[in-house]
Amino acid sequence: MQGSTRRMGVMTDVHRRFLQLLMTHGVLEEWDVKRLQTHCYKVHDRNATVDKLEDFINNINSVLESLYIEIKRGVTEDDGRPIYALVNLATTSISKMATDFAENELDLFRKALELIIDSETGFASSTNILNLVDQLKGKKMRKKEAEQVLQKFVQNKWLIEKEGEFTLHGRAILEMEQYIRETYPDAVKICNICHSLLIQGQSCETCGIRMHLPCVAKYFQSNAEPRCPHCNDYWPHEIPKVFDPEKERESGVLKSNKKSLRSRQH
């Protein structure tokens, strides 16, 4: 009885609007999710006390549980920013993408995904991806078309492009982790600290363990001589900066104040 009571949630218009808008965006950073939550309260229940974000999302997830859908929290691999995405637990994300992309476009994504997973850096060059166009299933695709499809994946937040190379967006990692673990068991990389799927990060040159950049930053945060957590050998890589939500919040407030100041001046 206690279990069933715990799983029952109450969806108000606030929750429904929040869910609808999150679905529209696909993925949002935590700062934007909090703003979205506040917006939904202002529209539907201005006088209500805004729930803690964690409680608010847990309430929605308890209702979505029977539909095999969940709002999942993750962090970006490059700088550790918290993100949220609506994840379909019943199907692989590639099949979920089928409503937005043609068969040959989905196959292009699979090819890109495989190159990214197999690479040491977590990136695949556009050249290497485009060289596989002739092997695609379905309708033939020219390289120029393939370039446009890759940009479509970027716009839809499935891929990130940096200097002509592609890696998985945080949304894709959140939605596809289980699929990637099952499909590429021999090539998949796992972070030694958080034990989640790792696409890009740093590795120990002695024992080979890997760590996400945000995990590296936190683990060695106050360590003058960083050493590998597994073999204790010297860690030779540059230690990235830790994402600081307080500084980010202050920055957001400053930007907001500047915008409002500019709007008053016009």
Swiss-Prot record:
The keyword Nucleus applies. Transmembrane segments: none annotated. It is found in: Nucleus; Chromosome, Telomere. Keywords: Chromosome, DNA damage, DNA recombination, DNA repair, Metal-binding, Nucleus, Phosphoprotein, Telomere, Transferase, Ubl conjugation, Ubl conjugation pathway, Zinc, Zinc-finger. A zinc finger (RING-type) spans 191-232. The modification Phosphoserine is found at S251. It is an enzyme of class 2 (transferase). Residues 246-266 are annotated as: Disordered. Its EC number is 2.3.2.27. GO terms for biological process: chromatin looping; DNA damage response; double-strand break repair via homologous recombination; protein sumoylation; regulation of telomere maintenance. It catalyses: S-ubiquitinyl-[E2 ubiquitin-conjugating enzyme]-L-cysteine + [acceptor protein]-L-lysine = [E2 ubiquitin-conjugating enzyme]-L-cysteine + N(6)-ubiquitinyl-[acceptor protein]-L-lysine. Its main location: nucleus. Residues 1-102 are annotated as: Interaction with NSMCE3. GO terms for cellular component: chromosome, centromeric region; chromosome, telomeric region; intracellular membrane-bounded organelle; mitotic spindle pole; nucleoplasm; nucleus; Smc5-Smc6 complex. Residues 256-266 have a biased composition (Basic residues). It comes from the Eukaryota. Ubiquitinated. One of its GO terms (molecular function) is zinc ion binding. The keyword Metal-binding applies. Belongs to the NSE1 family. Component of the SMC5-SMC6 complex which consists at least of SMC5, SMC6, NSMCE2, NSMCE1, NSMCE4A or EID3 and NSMCE3. NSMCE1, NSMCE4A or EID3 and NSMCE3 probably form a subcomplex that bridges the head domains of the SMC5-SMC6 heterodimer. Interacts with NSMCE3. Interacts with MAGEF1. RING-type zinc finger-containing E3 ubiquitin ligase that assembles with melanoma antigen protein (MAGE) to catalyze the direct transfer of ubiquitin from E2 ubiquitin-conjugating enzyme to a specific substrate. Within MAGE-RING ubiquitin ligase complex, MAGE stimulates and specifies ubiquitin ligase activity likely through recruitment and/or stabilization of the E2 ubiquitin-conjugating enzyme at the E3:substrate complex. Involved in maintenance of genome integrity, DNA damage response and DNA repair. This is Non-structural maintenance of chromosomes element 1 homolog. It comes from Homo sapiens (Human). The gene is NSMCE1.
